[in-house]
Amino acid sequence: MRRPGTLLAAAVVAAALILTAAAPSGAITFGQPDGNRHPYAGALLADWVPDSPGPDVFCSGTLIAADVFLTAGHCTSFLEEEGISPVGVTFDPAYDENAASPDGILSGTVITHPDFGFSGPGGASDPHDMAVVLLDDPPGITPAQLPTEGLLDELAEDNSLRSATFTVVGYGTVREQKTGGPHGILPIDGVRRFTLQTFQSLEPAWLTLSQQPSTGDAGACFGDSGGPHFLGGETSDLLVSITVSGDAQCRAADKTYRIDTASAREFLGEFVNLP
């Protein structure tokens, strides 16, 4: 969610913990360890916790080409201004945040959507909340699939979305209890997790998914921002949206940013071949 934000602590805690009615998203609620189900889902890293020995998870994302990692714009827009560098990516399903020199961290160049922003004309309706990390070296992982243009609109027209299952993956905070409010949210532990969701609503730039435990759904929380939402069950690799926002309790709804729109595809097309 727009839930990753001292300065990275303030910025990441600001970028990640802007928990209002529409707060950025973090970790998976009521989920389970992903293992190798979604090897192309990764975590965005930076050394932002003063007493931590190595780089820390602050957002999630997805490999969408051999060397292109997609995440959310609110995860990266403040990095240069706050002097947060370097930024890395890991695809380790159980990243060790307590290691001084963790293995497998990939370096790269961050590019935030030039029109990113939640203010100004059309800001909330289409914030262009996207960014990519152009990896210096490909990880040798088969990327996730991207959707065709307008796929979700087509599914909405024939009512397929109403019965569709979605899978969310991320490295964020964890909720395992249905009660307890914010106190029921556990800290990031470096484990990639997944869970399933159902459809709630579709807007021109947004796909809102249920994470109501009362209806058997679950979803994203702090630190899952930028992470993938796949159309289909736990074996699906068809990426249709990314985690951007949700509710402060991480148990009502995920508001995700669509990547099948002409607007999103215009940005993505600068870095990958689109279907």
Regions found by a protein language model. Give the residues of each.
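Chymotrypsin/trypsin-fold serine protease catalytic domain
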Residues: D126-M130, L134-D217, K255, T261-G269
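Solvent-exposed loop/turn segments at secondary-structure junctions
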Residues: W48, V68-L70, C75-S77, G117-F118, ...
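A generic structural motif
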Residues: L45-P50, D92-A94, V169, F230-G232
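C-terminal subregion of chymotrypsin/trypsin-like serine protease catalytic domains
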Residues: I28, D34-Y40, D56-S77, G83-Y95, ...
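Secretory targeting and sorting signals
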Residues: M1-A27
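Short, solvent-exposed aromatic-acidic interface loops
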Residues: I111-F116, Q211-A218, T243-A248
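Hydrophobic residues in beta-strands and at strand termini
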Residues: L44, L63, T71, F91, ...
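Conserved catalytic-core segment of clan PA serine endopeptidases
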Residues: I28-R37, S77, E82-D153, P187
